[in-house]
A protein has these predicted regions:
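Cell-envelope/extracellular polymer assembly enzymes that use nucleotide-activated donors
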Residues: 30-33, 61, 207
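Short, well-formed alpha-helical segments that are part of the catalytic scaffolds
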Residues: 18-19, 40-54
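Conserved nucleotide-sugar donor-binding catalytic segment
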Residues: 158-239
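Short aromatic/hydrophobic "clamp" motif used to bind/position activated sugar donors
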Residues: 114
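A conserved acidic beta->alpha catalytic loop
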Residues: 51, 66-75, 94, 118
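Glycine-rich, basic loop-to-helix element that forms the pyrophosphate-binding segment
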Residues: 92-109
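Catalytic core of nucleotide-sugar-dependent glycosyltransferases
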Residues: 225-231, 237-263, 286-299
Length: 330
């Protein structure tokens, strides 16, 4: 079921009121570092950074990490930094791509809490203060706060699987109960030496969130606090379909949390293995596809694994592509 997003101006403001009243200019209030990663998006970047400058949270650091833009994005970012001392602009010195660019931003962040934002998304004015108020109201019990987003194409919430503000268990996230795009705020100390895997081209954010969530409580705020922009450049349908690249993410996901899923949700684990099998088959690797099918069926009988088995005998051109909507990972 999908939930229609409310207008942000109609939402109650009780979550942000404490922040606004107690610490309008208090530098000792927990600093939040927003890492804004960008690459050749001068036409979206300005709107994105303006949404950060309009935030009503009093202690904010903005780290702009540029992945070697060839347009005017970097220069625009530098102009903003000259006018706003809490903005820092850095060039990516890690591997090119979204994972390396995020890691580069993390290297420069000094806040107690971290938020990651893409250069084509916008935050609503009270986004950070509302999430921080949850963090403070519960006396920092929740090291991870997530909120929903409004999709630009249809106005619906981008995050699905939950319909009320409450604590989210590790098992819910592990077993795929939540799906879609969410806005996340998390304690920097949770990272330690952990970083995004720069060898995975796409969709590796979820792996890091699972690692963090396994050892720290998480709270979901059922409000749209980010405008999640859907456009021609943000969907994989406009990319060359690369199943053997996509399957690397599945293999990492399966490997890292195999025992946890085997304990809590074997059916979900079996489906992940079957999906990996389909990707191997689409990439022309029948041998690995067959092994994944056997692994999937050994964990839990499921229809998808059986369907993928019959796909072994079909030409690649006849195989269905996975309907996975995810952002471009360069």
């Amino acid at each position: 079921m999908e939930y229609k997003a409310l207008n942000i101006n109609d939402l109650p403001k009780e979550f942000s009121q404490k922040v606004l009243e107690e610490a309008p200019d208090n530098p000792n209030f927990p600093k939040v570092s927003v890492i804004l990663t960008t690459y050749n998006r001068e036409y979206f970047f300005t709107e994105s950074i303006e949404s950060l400058l309009e935030q009503d949270y009093p202690n904010l650091e903005i780290i702009v990490s540029d992945d070697g833009s060839s347009d005017n994005t970097f220069n625009i970012a530098c102009e903003y930094a000259q006018e706003n001392p809490h903005i820092k602009v850095v060039r990516n010195t890690h591997a090119r791509g979204s994972a390396g660019n995020r890691n580069n931003g993390l290297d420069h962040a000094s806040g107690e809490l971290i938020m990651l934002l893409d250069d084509d998304d916008l935050l609503f004015k009270e986004a950070i203060s509302q999430m921080m108020n949850v963090y403070l109201d519960f006396d920092k019990h929740y090291g991870i706060i997530i909120a929903n987003c409004t999709r630009s194409d249809d106005g619906f919430l981008s995050g699905q699987g939950i319909s009320e503000s409450r604590e989210i268990s590790f098992q819910e996230v592990l077993c795929g109960c939540l799906d879609g795009e969410f806005l996340t705020l998390f304690e920097r100390q949770l990272l330690g030496q952990r970083r995004f895997n720069e060898n995975l081209r796409r969709g590796n954010m979820g792996l890091l969130w699972l690692k963090l969530h396994k050892n720290r409580a998480c709270y979901y705020l059922h409000k749209p606090l980010k405008f999640y922009r859907i456009h021609a450049e943000s969907l994989t349908q406009n990319l060359k379909y690369q199943p053997l690249e996509m399957v690397k993410n599945y293999e990492q996901d399966i490997l890292l949390f195999y025992r946890d899923r085997l304990k809590y949700c074997p059916a979900h684990l079996a489906r992940l293995c079957a999906t990996a099998a389909l990707l191997y088959r689409q990439g022309g690797d029948r041998k690995r596809a067959f092994k994944k099918i056997l692994q999937s069926l050994a964990i839990h009988p499921n229809l998808l694994a059986i369907q993928v088995f019959f796909c072994l005998f079909l030409p690649v051109s006849c195989l269905p592509k996975l309907k996975i909507r995810q952002r471009i990972e360069k």
